[in-house]
Amino acid sequence: MDKNYYKEYYVLEREHWWFKARAKIISNLIFKSLKNKEKNKLNILNIGAATGKTSDILSEFGTVTSLEYDKDCCDFTNSALNLNSIHGSILALPFREEEFDMVCALDVIEHVEDDMLGVSEMKRVCKSGGLIVVTVPAFMLLWSKHDEVNHHFRRYTMSSLKKIFTKINLTTIRATYFNTILFIPILAFRLLSKLIPTKFIRVGAGSDATLHNNNSISSKILYQIFKSELALLKLFNLPLGVSIFIISSKK
């Protein structure tokens, strides 16, 4: 893929309203779940690191090892950004058993056909008592050309995601939907987007970013709306949303 794409995606991960608000929510949910663990001394594996923003988020909790399946993306980030990403697949993680305190796959397992194997591999390299963090897109009702362009195999419900974790004997600490307030507008947009030619849908854009100027008033409003869910998530789990967050422990 053209290196300019990775440069654009690097900016997108750091400036687009969806990525920015998502980062704050995921960081907060992880922080609240750590409890008595040393919150800045964990050995962390970040699967699907892309251009490194999620690794930046996770670095507040400890030392992060970044893994990325896209070889061209690895080459770009390692040469241009000095991020030291490792090329590898979630289906065959190149690490020994019980190596990490926390293993994360943020919007990753929907990209692999055998998601059960992917989560099993996460469990294998996670220490006993360690944490496994996953986020995924929710509800096939929201399926659109965006999912097709980004090579998704599926979207999840809470029950379908929890079923995977239960089958491989992981204990759920917290599971919640998020990006809830914008669920109806995004549903409407996704339905309308079926009329948009696939070539105009940006690969990797979590919220169909081609239609938003990152500095526009609308983007700033959307960011504040999405970020406002932090207050709700401090009180309770959300009953539906565009995405799902789950954090589990390995016995």
Sequence positions of predicted segments:
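Short, glycine-/aromatic-enriched active-site segment of Class I SAM-dependent methyltransferases
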Residues: K7-E13, I132-R154, M158-T166
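Core SAM-dependent methyltransferase catalytic element
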Residues: R190, K194, L238-K251
